[in-house]
Amino acid sequence: VVGLGCQRGCDVHTLLGLLDAALADGGIERQRITALASIDRKHAEPGLLALARLLELPLQCFSAAQLAGYEQRLSHKSAVAFAHTGCYGIAESAALALAEQLSQRPARLLITRKKTAQATFALACAD
């Protein structure tokens, strides 16, 4: 499961570039991705919606309160993200939350937070 955070107006090409670069660095094929996750305030973000359509994957969004339960498992805590969203790490916590929801098992981060100027990426899986 890929978790994504992004600035308002971040376009699909920026998100796809980050996703592909992070997956390539991790040696993971794009077709192994089963879903995308983010925070609920991004549920209508055009770039995220376009990415989900392009990849033909579901996009599941979680509230900051739901993501807060993953705070202790984050590789990086962003004060900037917290100030804007109430969540210290959208990409990692959303990836963990959805991986656990889909598998009904504990999840772990396969690829920790990767970022560009406009977006963050993380990959989680359940063993």
What does each model-identified segment do?
Residues 16, 20, 49, 91-94:
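Predominant activation on well-ordered alpha-helical scaffold segments within soluble catalytic domains
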Residues 91-127:
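C-terminal edge-of-domain segments
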Residues 39, 48-90:
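Long, charge-dense
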Residues 1-2, 34-35, 59-60, 106-110, ...:
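Structural motif
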